[in-house]
Amino acid sequence: DMNEMRYSKLLVSIGKNLVENKRADNHFAAEVMERGGKLVNISPEYGPSSSKADYWLTIRPNTDTALLLGISKIIIDNNWHDEKFLKEFSDFPLLLRKDTLKRLKPEDLNKEYKNQLSKDGPSYTIHGLKKKQYDKIGDFTVFDKKSNSVKPLTRDDVGDLLEKKKIDPQLDWEGTISGADGNDIEVCTLFWAYKYVHLKDYDLDTVVDITHSNKELIQQLAKDLATIKPATIHIGEGLNHWF
């Protein structure tokens, strides 16, 4: 919701010229300024929005993804990420099979497992989930720190609903477990795969080489995103829409 931008203490605009071509929404950025918030503009050219920002991060066209992956690596490598939020509101704790790179399903461990999503939960009553969709999605698995074992989760088990189950998902984990057929399955959390596999190619020097962005400002933005809360990232026109 664009309305939420006005409450941000940090507003990062990527690929969007709020001043010139988003005049219906640029007052939100002005309100951030009035409240003493910080503005950051990421764009190839220095334009009106850049002139209003606290700092402008220039970037080579079509390299925004590399920049954001590099920033993610800095945040994770410095343990600046919000572990509690990632556990409760993201898919990072969910387990993946290393052999197929697909999610580890409860049925992989117990062939008699039955899906546990309640028809009275938010998926059905609020989100409008259909049984046909749920049959395709199924349930998920995490490695629980408390019991030191794999536990099933439904798509409703987030936030307070996860805490009520008294499950503490391990975020950064890999291991070997026994499957329903008795064979060992090598698994890892999505966070583990993201941190040690996907992000390993996006060290700071490599990102600078790809994006032509300023090294110090990349580090500054990573620190700002990790420490200034609440923050908003406003992405415009799909980033690669024009290039």
Identify the residue ranges that each predicted region occupies.
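Short, polar loop motifs at secondary-structure junctions
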Residues: 42-48
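Glycine/threonine-rich flexible loop motifs
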Residues: 17-29
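Glycine-rich oxoanion-binding loops at beta->alpha junctions
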Residues: 1-11
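Long, well-ordered, tryptophan-enriched scaffold segments
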Residues: 50-51, 55-227
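Acidic catalytic cores of enzymes that act on phosphate-bearing nucleotides/polynucleotides
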Residues: 219-243
